Amino acid sequence: MLLFLLRRIFDCRYKYKLFVKALVLFLTIVYNAGLVHFFFRTTSLDDSPEMNHVDYVAHVIVMPIVLSIGMINQCLNVCTLLHIRTSIFLYLKASAIADILSIVAFIPFLFRHAKLIDPSWELGMFYHAHLELPLINALISASALNIVAMTVDRYVSVCHPIKFFQNNETKPSRRRTMLIIVMIYFIALMIYFPSVFQKKLGVVTDALTNKTIYTIVRNEDVEALQVFKFYLIVRECICRWGPVLLLVILNMCVVRGLRKIDKRNWFWRQPSQNSRTETLAQRQLRSPRDDRSRISVLLFVTSATFIICNIPASVISFFVRRVSGSLFWQIFRAIANLLQVTSYLYNFYLYALCSSEYRHAFLRLFGCRSSLSPTSTGDSPTVRVSVHGKRCHQAVVLLGNENHENPVDEV
């Protein structure tokens, strides 16, 4: 039934409107379920039962549902991308794999908030204190940085096609892409390595059972260092604000480049003034032009959703010391964390919106379409762009885009 509905949406003329409406409706339901009513219901700023209730609803009830749906979407995403041979899609594959790994890394995080862990297990508590959040945030950052790398590649192919092809001729595209992906994963892990020392284990002995219990506390000595404060600023710029600014700026440049390409192609294919009939070139160009207009809107929507999902987490990182004793900041933190994990939900659908090649690969995955490669259209990830001069140079332009997620802050 789900595959039938997806196929009907793919064949719908105004499919992007249906996807946007469904996305907005789903996000509205998720955010209102167990979160918004707390903001209007509670007024105390230091009420431990209420804060525990907020934490339980956000991280034990709502977040597992979101992550479960996100895992299904990301698995479908990876399986679909495996059927696409284009080297540029390696960035999307690497991003989706990082998302799957981060969802798996979220499982101990959820167990800890559900109080399903043994606080007397030293090795387990050591992982929760030192490795849990840095690993999650590093994987989320790797996913976001892969999208940034893909966007940079797309920007060069659209705005500087000759230089793009010169680079592809001198260096193998697939090998270069794999090297960049490995470097991105390594850089993301190195960026969050100092965060390992941000928390430490506290030891408490139960007087009744004489049992040692380990607790997670903030390492105030490390956080007070000026070097560590400078590191936090650099980390936020690289992993949060940097990807946001780059995606917005580069996507705007890509949209402008696509419009220029559309105007140039339309000018060169104009019929004579005496011709009253529509030429074959016009009929072939009209559909890609409409598709590129739709892609321009989608690029704007995806950039806006990327900012909405990640800016709250960036704000909470600057007020981390106020979170533990304030109900308002606990609610804000819960909403920020949920906003970030919702990015796992919609990127699969945005890929399907932006790329007909992706849709064809998804349908071939379930045997709904023949294995023949589809003809590239205006919304396909590979579009032939004519550069008029002495000769027509052709550039491969990636038109797909998605939002990703940035690191989660938790105190």
From Swiss-Prot:
Report the glycosylation sites.
N210
Pfam families xref list = 7tm_1
Keyword Glycoprotein attributed: yes
User: What GO cellular component entries does it have?
Assistant: plasma membrane
Instruction: Tell me the residue ranges located in the Cytoplasmic compartment per UniProt.
Output: 1-18, 77-87, 153-176, 251-299, 355-411
Enumerate the UniProt keywords alphabetically: Cell membrane, G-protein coupled receptor, Glycoprotein, Membrane, Receptor, Transducer, Transmembrane, Transmembrane helix
Q: PROSITE patterns, per this entry?
A: G_PROTEIN_RECEP_F1_1, G_PROTEIN_RECEP_F1_2
The membrane-topology field of this record reads: Multi-pass membrane protein
Molecular function (Gene Ontology), one example: G protein-coupled receptor activity
Cellular localisation: Cell membrane
Extracellular face residues: 40-55, 109-131, 198-229, 321-333
Segments passing through the bilayer: 19-39, 56-76, 88-108, 132-152, 177-197, 230-250, 300-320, 334-354
Query: Which InterPro entries did the record assign?
Result: GPCR-like, GPCR_Rhodpsn, GPCR_Rhodpsn_7TM
For this chain, the family text in UniProt reads:
Belongs to the G-protein coupled receptor 1 family.
Outline what the protein does: Not known. Putative receptor.
Name of the protein described by the UniProt record: Probable G-protein coupled receptor AH9.1
Upper lineage ranks?
Eukaryota, Metazoa, Ecdysozoa, Nematoda, Chromadorea
